[in-house]
Amino acid sequence: MDALVAHCSARLLQQEKEIKFLTAEVDRLKNYSCSEASADLEKLREENLKLKYRLNILRKSLQAERNKPTKTMININSCLEEVFGCAIKAAYPVLENPPLIVTPSQQPKFGDYQCNSAMGICQMLKTKEQKVNPREIAENIVKHLPDNEYIEKVEIAGPGFINIHLRKGFVSQQLTNLLVNGVKIPSIGENKKVIVDFSSPNIAKEMHVGHLRSTIIGESMCRLFEFAGYNVLRLNHVGDWGTQFGMLIAHLQDKFPDYLTVSPPIGDLQAFYKESKKRFDTEEEFKKRAYQCVVLLQSKNPDIIKAWKLICDVSRQEFNKIYEALDISLIERGESFYQDRMHDIVKEFEDRGFVQVDDGRKIVFVPGCSVPLTIVKSDGGYTYDTSDLAAIKQRLFEEKADMIIYVVDNGQSLHFQTVFGAAQMIGWYDPAVTRVSHAGFGVVLGEDKKKFKTRSGETVRLIDLLEEGLKRSMDKLKEKERDKVLTTEELKAAQTSVAYGCIKYADLSHNRLNDYIFSFDKMLDDRGNTAAYLLYAFTRIRSIARLANIDEEMLRKAAHETEIILDHEKEWKLGRCILRFPEVLQKILDDLLLHTLCDYIYELATTFTEFYDSCYCVEKDRQSGEVLKVNMWRMLLCEAVAAVMAKGFDILGIKPVQRM
């Protein structure tokens, strides 16, 4: 129906332009015979009236559809944009693509939302030599506002800002819908496929702190896309191919000659890698054998393939320990997966005339990129460039992805810019149709603001970092004497929740584009914008109903029967904050910056604290502690906050606990 309204509106606009033109023609021909022009004009006017009538019916029908109870939360900002978009179109039908700016107000005195389009429209009209001030434009927009269920009143402030006040009944109804139906947003990703490429460690090397960001950010993005209804393919593009496997396999043959029949106890793969690397750098004979093993691997020699699989399996077991601890879900599809596609990729670029030869290398220059891609080395081998081109083509043509997101550090931005440019140049995708993005991120720094290292100067192993987090988390809980009030199981759950939650949140709450300083002390602080504070706030909210002897069934019944009153300013502020959740998520789907969600959850928690300190949810006898009165509509507000926080935590990959 939206499309039909848009189509009618466009036709109406075109007709109004034609009427203007013909009216001018009639005026010009006043002194001459103009019966033909007049006849055309009358015909257009008649059709125009019919269209206006039809459009009015369609708009009313669309509004009636919208007024039906919905099972999902609505994006209020988008709804207001639609309303003001209609008003601007009606007020200024001749303007093409006028600015449409609706945002939440920063201060209560400016209403709940603001429309700041008048200033931009004023600039557009000035270019058409029309003298008008922004305030007059704002008044004209307000005059053309269609009937809607959202707006109580509007006020024009300053030079032309339109302050929007929402209807309390509308906000109350939306909160009731949330409580009755759960925290859901419209399925905007229905029938769309997203591929997220993240984590991607190298086989035979341990995961280190550098892999933490890609793993955490990528997982959270996947959860958000899934919540928005997308079909998500989570890919782990591991480094499981290349010359390093030659030296690893040659070393395996020497150290465990019976590896084909007896499973070799490799144990510490990192040490195994270092041993083979040392031999590769110092023993010429070993180096030759290593290169022979690479050739045999590429030709799929069965014995060499078995050795390769053994090494990959040992690595995979270590990776999976970390993925399991952090609740990360991935499908492994490493560089080896794309090996058989490399030859065809090179041929396709050659056939299209994009390949140049430079010192025996086959290179591809991409417009706007300073460094070419090397798709074949001088020794005839393929490169990361070749495998990344093979990967992007497979994802576009075989997986039929509508969107591909690469969660890889900022250092790779030029590489991905060139790969994406090459894929567009050869015609694999159109960026106007398919979104292919590099979601880059900064490095993890120590408290000295240098790259995060151990005291001996080595890269911090991720498994060690997680174990240290668990230790510090338990110390913090014992410091607060939680071990005296929680059962052993509850204490263990709280320890894991705080440790991993704090590590994830510390990363996600920073703008991913920037470097961030890793500090256990800061992330475990239960004050400020930290997971520790938010997890404590969540358990506190969850405990309010429990301590008032209100069970889930009573809350469910109340959600259907109790009107949510929003008369107190703190109730109103909290209600509006809860309902901003869908617009926050929409922004992140657009820019992939997850710290916005962290900021929102923190704002929701602090807004709840203001509400709880000002509004009694449960009134008790001060002497006996007996519950005298329960303000059920406020209990429902508590429940709505907890529900939204729980979904926010879930998207961030954080597991809250009921007791802490």
From Swiss-Prot:
Key words, A-Z: Acetylation, Aminoacyl-tRNA synthetase, ATP-binding, Cytoplasm, Ligase, Nucleotide-binding, Protein biosynthesis
Superkingdom, natural source: Eukaryota
Molecular function in Gene Ontology: arginine-tRNA ligase activity; ATP binding
A Pfam entry, by short name: tRNA-synt_1d
Stretches for region Interaction with tRNA: 529-543
Chief subcellular location: cytoplasm
Quaternary structure annotation from Swiss-Prot or TrEMBL: Interacts (via N-terminus) with AIMP1 (via N-terminus); this stimulates its catalytic activity. Interacts (via N-terminus) with LARS2 (via C-terminus). Monomer. Part of a multisubunit complex that groups tRNA ligases for Arg (RARS1), Asp (DARS1), Gln (QARS1), Ile (IARS1), Leu (LARS1), Lys (KARS1), Met (MARS1) the bifunctional ligase for Glu and Pro (EPRS1) and the auxiliary subunits AIMP1/p43, AIMP2/p38 and EEF1E1/p18. Interacts with QARS1. Part of a complex composed of RARS1, QARS1 and AIMP1.
The name this protein goes by in its record: Arginine--tRNA ligase, cytoplasmic
Gene: RARS1
